[in-house]
């Protein structure tokens, strides 16, 4: 089971396809914790991506980290590595959710 609002290490693979994020990085779980699915929806992160209004930024493990809501995706649970490394506070998760809604025009 994954925890909504938790930040995990994820492996997005090494296949280079356009501008999609790849490799190992942190990812924020947005899927509901109560759903026993074989995939989970994540927002990948980056410490080097360009800032944007739809990319909330906050400190994770001592580094300023951007949440790439423009790269949201579902991945197999096997690509989550180990236990969460960070948990977003309620207001931090709300900030990311708001950015997702704005980016998707919801």
List each model region and its residues.
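Conserved functional hotspots at enzyme active or ligand-binding sites that engage polyanionic ligands
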Residues: 1-106
